[in-house]
Amino acid sequence: LHAPHDSGAYHRSRRTVSALMKQGAQVLIDVHRDSAPAQAYRTEINGQQVARVKLVVGRRNPNSSANLGYAKKVKAFLDQNYPGLAKGIFVGRGVYNQDLRPTSILLEVGSNQTTLGEAKAAVGLFANTLPEITGINPETGARQVSQTADEGSNWRSLGWLIAAVIIGGAGYLLIST
């Protein structure tokens, strides 16, 4: 979506993120692919070969503690519902635009060696978990549990989040293959 992937990519994507936040997005997920051997990122879930995902949190921003807590919540939920999908949490040196929201993560979906189909399958599984992680019922749009404003506000936010993950992920996956 924000090609080329160079030192200016986060500056360019920041405009998109800011626009999504103005429309009500409460959770930010930046989708990438890692550079690693396929076997490091390949697993089988429910009989289907999928790419594994790694959650990345930047430590050089004021939201790093909150983002790490959010990443731990997401990983725990993935581990419970799709064992083996989450490769782990990596705390990196960057900011990754995570200074914009305390519910931000960078998601490495497979590697440049896993297939586009495996990556799409992983994004689909991850997207399936978003309603429960954010506490929003996908059928009614209502909150399922009491939450703070930082954890999600409404169905529209979830819709924008899912759209951003799918569009950004698909765009990046197409560019990187």
Label for each model-derived stretch:
Residues L1-A40:
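Catalytic-core regions of hydrolytic enzymes
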Residues H2-H11, T16-S18, V56-S65, E108-E118:
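Second-shell loop/turn segments in exported
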Residues M21-Q26, R59-A66, P131-V145:
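Generic structural signal for short, solvent-exposed loop/turn connectors between secondary structure elements
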Residues V145-I166:
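Juxtamembrane/start-of-transmembrane alpha-helix segments at the extracytoplasmic/lumenal side
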Residues I166-T177:
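C-terminal membrane-anchoring or membrane-association module
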